[in-house]
UniProtKB/Swiss-Prot annotation:
Its EC number is 3.6.1.23. It comes from Shigella sonnei (strain Ss046). This is Deoxyuridine 5'-triphosphate nucleotidohydrolase. GO terms for molecular function: dUTP diphosphatase activity; magnesium ion binding. Keywords: Hydrolase, Magnesium, Metal-binding, Nucleotide metabolism. Substrate binds at R70, S71, G72, N83, L87, I88, D89, M97. Belongs to the dUTPase family. InterPro entries: dUTPase (IPR008181), dUTPase-like (IPR029054), dUTPase-like_sf (IPR036157), dUTPase_trimeric (IPR033704).
Length: 151
């Protein structure tokens, strides 16, 4: 298992607020918590940046982290990430902040220590562009949105 450096920026993390952990042996994501002093109410349509109290340094350029919404918050309450997916590059070392957006119909209150997002680690391949005049033909060709049908 790959080890990632984590810096605790808020002394409550690891005491009042648990460190991120995998819920089960098959979990892909680590839950990130709202490292808040007071509850924050999000009205419908509002968004805010929520600190996690953590910084990470992935260091390995073949890895990146992605912040994703928690499925229950999105489905039950309309709480998703303001940027839909957050991407953490391997050389970033600042605090992990979560952009939280209430796309629901009702106000939602984020409590201190509440699990608000999840983070996964993914492999990265950096591409190098090769300029060409034409591509080799494929069955799909230039077919775009909806080209392959619904069934």
């Amino acid at each position: 298992m790959k080890k990632i450096d984590v810096k605790i920026l808020d002394p409550r993390v690891g005491k009042e607020f648990p460190l991120p952990t995998y819920a089960t042996s098959g979990s892909a994501g680590l839950d990130l918590r709202a490292c808040l002093d007071d509850a924050v109410e999000l009205a419908p349509g509002d968004s805010t940046l929520v600190p996690t109290g953590l910084a990470i340094h992935i260091a390995d350029p073949s890895l990146a982290a992605m912040m994703l919404p928690r499925s229950g918050l999105g489905h039950k309450h309309g709480i998703v990430l303001g940027n839909l997916v957050g991407l953490i590059d391997s050389d970033y070392q600042g605090q992990l902040m979560i952009s939280v957006w209430n796309r629901g119909q009702d106000s939602f209150t984020i409590q201190p220590g509440e699990r608000i997002a999840q983070m996964i680690f993914v492999p990265v391949v950096q591409a190098e562009f090769n300029l060409v005049e034409d591509f080799d033909a494929t069955d799909r060709g230039e077919g775009g949105f909806g080209h392959s049908g619904r069934q």
